[in-house]
Amino acid sequence: MLVLAIETSCDETAAALVDGGRRILSSVVSSQVAIHAEYGGVVPEIASRKHLEMISPVISQALAEAGVSFGDIQGVAVTRGPGLSGALLVGLSAAKAIACARGIPFVGVHHIEGHLFAPFLERPVEFPFLALVVSGGHTHLYLVEGFGRYRTLGRTLDDAAGEAFDKSAKIMGLPYPGGARIDAMAQEGSPGAIRLPRPLLADGGLNFSFSGLKTAMLNRITKHPVSIPGAEANDLCASFQQAVCDVLVAKTAAALERTGVTRLVVAGGVACNSGLRRSMQALASGLSIDLRIPAPALCGDNAAMLAVPGNHYLEQGHASELSMDVTATWDMDRVGEGRS
């Protein structure tokens, strides 16, 4: 099935053409990072207006790069939620319009569900598998037993890992988004140079908390300002990044032990982080498990990842109704209700 996938949950307008839920014919992403950098974070109203401006050009570009027309599309997959309501509505409206005009089915997909299956665009993963999804808004551990069959094992109790990266970067005076900048500076620093907390590291549970680490960064910068560029700033970035990675790895290792699964997916925007990729590779090597981390282009928000579960649901006859609305909050444990 040739699926047009559309993603507009936050600040990327994306469209992709994927054949059979596996072969990417095109994947176009229009980022708003430069626009929101002026405000130090995503402004929902501005994001929605930019999506309205870019949705048609992005879809047209995806079709052109794939060498197909609207008449070739057999189904549409679109992010229904979670995300910014106004932003989601732009993508959903476009998907409904195309599906209605062409007389083809469409399906609303959970944004995180897309991240879970991003590795399938490179090589399928056998069920069951453990998934760690780390991004600006999510830090969750899931047991994935099949399409639509997800069990949340752990989640952030406050800030997500990506949010902690961006807020800590802002505290240091680094430009938005700061996660990539911290990663780059960390490679020039010493991860053991500055002592920082590892929240909930030894609590015995699988939940995460990064607000305390963020506060520790604020206190450190307040008492000991650093010059950028500079060796001390690099050390602080390296120490912060190592603290985050230590927590993520420890919780993931505990989840692997509890579930007994031998396959691990690490996905989401923070999965681009070089320190996290190295740490997870070391964990996988030590435990002899099958680790899948998508290529960086598939870690950040994109539309192609939505086509994997979208294609499955459409082929199973689980299309969405035109009356379906966006949902800004959506529990992953309930995604499979009414379909599988």
From Swiss-Prot:
It comes from Pelobacter propionicus (strain DSM 2379 / NBRC 103807 / OttBd1). The keyword Iron applies. Keywords: Acyltransferase, Cytoplasm, Iron, Metal-binding, Transferase, tRNA processing. Its EC number is 2.3.1.234. Substrate binds at residues 133-137, 166, 179, 183, 273. Its cofactor is Fe(2+). The gene is tsaD. It is found in: Cytoplasm. This is tRNA N6-adenosine threonylcarbamoyltransferase. GO terms for biological process: tRNA threonylcarbamoyladenosine modification. Required for the formation of a threonylcarbamoyl group on adenosine at position 37 (t(6)A37) in tRNAs that read codons beginning with adenine. Is involved in the transfer of the threonylcarbamoyl moiety of threonylcarbamoyl-AMP (TC-AMP) to the N6 group of A37, together with TsaE and TsaB. TsaD likely plays a direct catalytic role in this reaction. One of its GO terms (cellular component) is cytoplasm. It catalyses: L-threonylcarbamoyladenylate + adenosine(37) in tRNA = N(6)-L-threonylcarbamoyladenosine(37) in tRNA + AMP + H(+). Belongs to the KAE1 / TsaD family. Binds 1 Fe(2+) ion per subunit. GO terms for molecular function: iron ion binding; N(6)-L-threonylcarbamoyladenine synthase activity. CDD domains: ASKHA_NBD_TsaD_bac. Pfam families: TsaD. Fe cation binds at residues 111, 115, 301. NCBIfam families: gcp_kae1 (TIGR00329), T6A_TsaD_YgjD (TIGR03723).
